[in-house]
Amino acid sequence: MENIITATIFGSVILLAAAALGTAIGFSLLGGKFLESSARQPELAASLQTKMFIVAGLLDAISMIAVGIALLFIFANPFIGLLN
């Protein structure tokens, strides 16, 4: 049982780290491409900014889903029920 709890905690940590790393890389790419495109065509900056914030919200939702799954695995571990 201790092995399952330990593996679940390690899996949750890896899940959170991957979500944080992916979100950070995604935000940096999104911001860089937004600055590049708004510098190339300044008249589209307002339209691009709106779309950038929508995509940033969707990108942030991915990490929030990962946090929810990790909290599920840590506090309500479904794998412990398989032992009985």
Curated annotation (Swiss-Prot):
User: Which GO cellular component does the record give, naming just one?
Assistant: plasma membrane
Keyword terms, alphabetized: ATP synthesis, Cell inner membrane, Cell membrane, CF(0), Hydrogen ion transport, Ion transport, Lipid-binding, Membrane, Transmembrane, Transmembrane helix, Transport
**Compartments, as annotated in UniProt:** Cell inner membrane
- Name which cysteines form disulfide bonds: none
- Extract the GO molecular function terms from the UniProt entry: lipid binding; proton-transporting ATP synthase activity, rotational mechanism
Pfam families from the xrefs? ATP-synt_C
Principal localisation: membrane
Q: Which SUPFAM superfamilies match?
A: F1F0 ATP synthase subunit C
Q: Does the keyword Transport apply?
A: yes
Q: What does the record say about its membrane topology?
A: Multi-pass membrane protein
Q: Which domain of life is it from?
A: Bacteria
> Is this entry keyworded Calcium?
no
Transmembrane segments in this chain: where?
Answer: 9-29, 54-74
Residues the record marks as site: Reversibly protonated during proton transport: 60
UniProt cross-references to NCBIfam families, sorted A to Z: ATP_synt_c (TIGR01260), PRK06876.1 (NF005363)
Question: Subunit composition?
Answer: F-type ATPases have 2 components, F(1) - the catalytic core - and F(0) - the membrane proton channel. F(1) has five subunits: alpha(3), beta(3), gamma(1), delta(1), epsilon(1). F(0) has three main subunits: a(1), b(2) and c(10-14). The alpha and beta chains form an alternating ring which encloses part of the gamma chain. F(1) is attached to F(0) by a central stalk formed by the gamma and epsilon chains, while a peripheral stalk is formed by the delta and b chains.
Summarize the protein's role: F(1)F(0) ATP synthase produces ATP from ADP in the presence of a proton or sodium gradient. F-type ATPases consist of two structural domains, F(1) containing the extramembraneous catalytic core and F(0) containing the membrane proton channel, linked together by a central stalk and a peripheral stalk. During catalysis, ATP synthesis in the catalytic domain of F(1) is coupled via a rotary mechanism of the central stalk subunits to proton translocation. Key component of the F(0) channel; it plays a direct role in translocation across the membrane. A homomeric c-ring of between 10-14 subunits forms the central stalk rotor element with the F(1) delta and epsilon subunits.
Would you identify the family this protein belongs to, as annotated? Belongs to the ATPase C chain family.
Put simply, this protein is called ATP synthase subunit c
Give the originating organism.
Answer: Histophilus somni (strain 2336)
What gene is this protein translated from? atpE
